[in-house]
Amino acid sequence: MQDRLHILEDLNMLYIRQMALSLEDTELQRKLDHEIRMREGACKLLAACSQREQALEATKSLLVCNSRILSYMGELQRRKEAQVLGKTGRRPSDSGPPAERSPCRGRVCISDLRIPLMWKDTEYFKNKGDLHRWAVFLLLQLGEHIQDTEMILVDRTLTDISFQSNVLFAEAGPDFELRLELYGACVEEEGALTGAPKRLATKLSSSLGRSSGRRVRASLDSAGGSGSSPILLPTPAVGGPRYHLLAHTTLTLAAVQDGFRTHDLTLASHEENPAWLPLYGSVCCRLAAQPLCMTQPTASGTLRVQPAGEMQNWAQVHGVLKGTNLFCYRRPEDADTGEEPLLTIAINKETRVRAGELDQALGRPFTLSISNQYGDDEVTHTLQTESREALQSWMEALWQLFFDMSQWKQCCDEIMKIETPASRKPPQALAKQGSLYHEMAIEPLDDIAAVTDILTQREGTRLETPPPWLAMFTDQPALPNPCSPASVAPAPAWTHPLPWGRPRTFSLDAVPPDHSPRARSVAPLPPQRSPRTRGLCSKGQPRTWLQSPV
Amino acid sequence: MSYIPGQPVTAVVQRVEIHKLRQGENLILGFSIGGGIDQDPSQNPFSEDKTDKVNGWDMTMVTHDQARKRLTKRSEEVVRLLVTRQSLQKAVQQSMLS
């Protein structure tokens, strides 16, 4: 059976390669070749793995490669079909109306992914003595592009699964569908009875037939994940870890927002699945999109502008249409050097643009006017282009922009910030990860400094030399003076940045301040507090520390 | 380290505005101040909140008495302070990280 599978697999690979070659689609062909090589590498690595954690990483790579190969194959099929249909049939649209306007592409970025878990203190956890651990990761697909997040180890001390990855898709259209799939695998060997007590072990082994049969069926159902049929791309190492699809969802333009949102997850596995995790049923993330029309200039050229309200002063400018603004610079170079434009005209969904007629009477041809409503006022700018062709191309650019804004909707209100994802570090030692919840033990009387301390330590402190003014705080003794008659209101006595611990307030030790209006201040502190001045006659040396109520 | 008393220094400050309380026929702030250029800093039991300016008046080079007077002017109901404290530096670092 295995031999037949191998033969089928080889034939499939051959077919795929041939198809890619025949299409002469070098880009897709190159990507396919790359994935096939990666897949071979992952298979070899998996066979050579001795440790479970390594096997988990290798299996994950294999799963991602398989998904990519299948998706590229699907894309190839589609393109081949389109090519064949194009050659044979006479397209009915040839004599029809011109091609439909298509919206600009954009960059879609998903980040700060967090999946809440819902642990219950049921018998399941109490019986298994050891801490159960799972390895999980997310597979994200947009069009034919597939990307994965890092793998995270989960156990019942985590309240959420939080992924650090930023995943960016570069060529998305406004009708994009971003499919998100959560895969999980047991870190312990599936079906291992090493942790269970002997009585439980005998009980389990006697009923192994039924439960293992169920497990095997469950594994086969999700073998390789993302719907790949085992015949096409079988997983070679049968004894290795197996990832199961735990949940999925699809996000579209409606889910895009410059902020965090929660979306529902469709749960795909049930309790009998060996890798089942108690998912709460939602995923939180930040899904941002930057249409190209917002970040790239869509038109530029020389214009003559009549500033609103002034009849005669036509200024020559270099206009650049970018995002929701038409910037008019004094000179073409200013656009690149970051100089402020002479004039900025807003272009948004409410803007009205008209070509021509307004100034024909004044002998100025090829004009267009842009009107915006600001409250009760309407402000109109009139621009003159150089020629009929120039006017046509400006109008075309503006119509395209209006179309893009209608398609990309909320993404065109303001540019959403997208951080270029840093190249991911290789998988580190798979230590148990705590959630921020466990690290924060915040007491009620805390100072903002405590919170910033914890956050700084978590992010990793920058090794910066402290600024000079901090030296003003380093010369103080740490002890309170119990004889001090007045207390100072804000008081935790920290002399230097301490590792986080409960602050001590001294106001409890001191006598409450007396606010009777006195002209003179309180008596100076007893001189034994200043060992430095004891026995010395240093004249100019201050010897007191006065405190006064104000 | 490099702080020399009496020399100008640049620091991160926080603006604090306090409205005085009425106690009898007096306006008070409700806390005490300690120190001054004429005091011994090594006897300071606390190390928080050094005041740089009070209502525009420079406080970095004042004696204890002068400081007290500036804070207790009968005619002023509101005191605006520029205060520096160590934890401000951590807040700056944190905002630079994010």
Curated annotation (Swiss-Prot), chain B:
Residues 12-87 form the PDZ domain. It is a peripheral membrane protein. Detected in kidney distal convoluted tubules (at protein level). The keyword Secreted does not apply. InterPro entries: PDZ_sf. It is found in: Cytoplasm; Nucleus; Cell membrane. GO terms for cellular component: cytoplasm; nucleus; plasma membrane. The modification N-acetylserine is found at residue 2. Keywords: Acetylation, Cell membrane, Cytoplasm, Membrane, Nucleus, Wnt signaling pathway. One of its GO terms (biological process) is negative regulation of cell population proliferation. One of its GO terms (molecular function) is beta-catenin binding. The keyword Acetylation applies. Interacts (via its PDZ domain) with GLS2. Interacts (via its PDZ domain) with RTKN (via the C-terminal region); this interaction facilitates Rho-mediated activation of the FOS serum response element (SRE). Interacts (via PDZ domain) with ARHGEF16. Interacts (via PDZ domain) with KCNJ4 (via C-terminus). Competes with LIN7A for KCNJ4 binding. Interacts (via its PDZ domain) with CTNNB1; this interaction inhibits the transcriptional activity of CTNNB1. Interacts with ADGRB2. May regulate a number of protein-protein interactions by competing for PDZ domain binding sites. Binds CTNNB1 and may thereby act as an inhibitor of the Wnt signaling pathway. Competes with LIN7A for KCNJ4 binding, and thereby promotes KCNJ4 internalization. May play a role in the Rho signaling pathway. This is Tax1-binding protein 3.
